[in-house]
Every structure is written in C-alpha cells, then in structure tokens.
Amino acid sequence: VTAAFEKHRMETEVHVDRLEEVFEKFGKSARGKTCPAIDGIIEEGSEILEDYDGAPALDAGLVAAAQAVEHYEIARYGTLVAWAEQMGKADVAALLKATLKEEVATDEALTGLGEGGVNQRALQAAA
C-alpha cells in the first residue's frame, strides 16, 4: 500500500505540471486552491489512521479512502476533458486525458490491492 501511495505521489507532481501547462494555454496563472470535498476525504483518512493504527483493517481503510480521492479526480478530469473538447482545445484535452488515464490506472491498481488480499486480511482479522 505504501509503495502504491508513493508512486501516485510522484505522478501527482506530473499532474500539477500538466495543469500549469493547461492554465498557460489559456493565458492564466495556476494557483493552489483548497477543495472542501477532498479535505473531507482526507479527514476521513486521518480518522481511519487513528481508529485502525496497527490493525489489518488499516490498509483496507486507506485503500478505500484513496479510491474516494481517485473517483473525485476522475469525475473532475472527465468534465475538464469534455469542456476542452467542446471548446475545440485539442491540445488541452490531450493533456487532461493523459492525467485522466493515469487516475483511472491508479484506481484500478487500488482495486487490485483491495481484491489482492488487503480486504481479505482485514475481514479475517475482524472475524
């Protein structure tokens, strides 16, 4: 689970670079902005860390929280791709599609972790 999170953290740096490029194509400067939805998901993840620290359910809970973030990002990038295409901005759409593809791949990898044993270990420990 830790390796998957680290891999995605590094991918996120590339995603930020792409977003900065998208903003440049519109003649704008990118800026960080707080997202209450993501903040809520992160808060849930923090609660999972507190409640299940050291327990087998911890990894399952963290995978679930990470997938919630991925699903939010997939929804947002999907919308941005559609808007870019409708605006005739194929170059922007291509940048956003690259990130969308990586977000979907991360979600699939997280599903693989869950189905590959993380969820089962949590269930066995709870029984």
Can you describe what each PLM-predicted range is?
Residues 1-127:
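Amphipathic alpha-helical hairpins
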